[in-house]
């Protein structure tokens, strides 16, 4: 989340009116005003990239800068409800020991894009015996300190690939995504916690006996 100020009253008024509008609001990306509108890195990048959310824009951006707890004042839906409304999610992790967001996505049968700098991405690769692809339900992209542009291109290509798929292909990918999520249930992972606690307790006992 960013340094959120308050919900946009001009946006709220339009939503409540139920009317159709053909003129954009000021700063037509963001749902809530920020305390630092002129210094927010996301907004700065959108402006730098020439994003406008105009009628002719092929890409429309909706920047929700707050926690999705169901009480944000504009959408008033939870994060999980929002995930369900997606066809594909993108979490291009730079570093996450595990990374729950792509796992949560596939648990809702929504395919995800992540990287091998997330533990989840590495784990999915281990399931597949190599880099997981979009058809598997999770696309894992190689990311390092030096390949930002390559990662951006890979994300772009994957989104374009997904958008060209037939409904039958998407259904299969969604099923594969859910199958991956099933393998991450606690009933499968809990044994590793038992093993870790066992090792820790044995080592603690050795230290006590050596005193």
Feature locations, PLM:
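Catalytic cores of carbohydrate-active enzymes across secretory and cytosolic contexts
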Residues: 1-211
